[in-house]
């Protein structure tokens, strides 16, 4: 009787357990949505620089500020990471990761490795599409949308964006 109960309990735990993939991230690497740039710099274990908005975003920039991390290794691939802050509140709302030139993430093998890594972490993407010759994979999580965008040859970008009531966001 006790063994049968434990068996039923184990099956119930498997049925109702949340899958490892698809867990909400609410930000990126300890930097949570809504943090100020000072708070983000304190929680990261990497040196960041204040990015010049005019050069990284253009004249018609909807961002309030940006921090930049020049080299981040994700699954053996190197990325430049930007943290985007809202205007005028200056709160973190998006993180963009750009594959560095010469990084394997920019070629087809590197793209596949990053896609597989994201699928391991977040589960299967909800949508897969092609937009102007670029592959777009999207993982909508409860408070964050993760988007992998690549031409599968030399450009790969990953964007973590806070879900809000409005569309748009980080660059």
Kindly give the residue locations of the regions a language model identified.
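Bacterial N-terminal signal peptides that target proteins for export
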Residues: 1-8
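Extended hydrophobic/Leu-rich segments
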Residues: 6, 53, 67-69
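N-terminal signal peptide c-region/cleavage motif recognized by signal peptidases
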Residues: 12, 17-19
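Generic, well-ordered alpha-helical segments
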Residues: 17, 32, 75-77
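Non-cytosolic coordination micro-motifs
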Residues: 20-64, 89, 94-171
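Compositionally biased P/S/T/G-rich terminal and signal peptide-adjacent segments
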Residues: 68-88
């Amino acid at each position: 009787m006790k063994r049968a109960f434990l068996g039923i309990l184990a099956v119930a735990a498997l049925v109702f357990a949340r899958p490892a993939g698809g867990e909400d991230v609410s930000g990126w690497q300890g930097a949570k949505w809504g943090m100020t740039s000072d708070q983000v710099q304190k929680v990261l274990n990497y040196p960041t620089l204040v990015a010049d908005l005019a050069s990284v975003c253009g004249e018609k920039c909807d961002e309030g500020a940006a921090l930049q991390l020049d080299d981040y290794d994700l699954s053996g691939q190197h990325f430049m990471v930007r943290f985007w802050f809202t205007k005028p509140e200056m709160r973190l709302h998006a993180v963009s990761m750009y594959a560095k030139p010469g990084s394997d993430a920019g070629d087809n093998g590197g793209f596949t490795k990053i896609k597989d890594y994201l699928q391991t972490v977040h589960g299967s993407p909800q949508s897969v599409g092609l937009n102007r010759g670029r592959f777009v994979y999207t993982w909508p999580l409860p408070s964050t949308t993760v988007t992998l965008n690549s031409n599968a040859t030399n450009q790969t970008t990953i964007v973590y964006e806070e879900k809000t009531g409005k569309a748009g966001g980080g660059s």
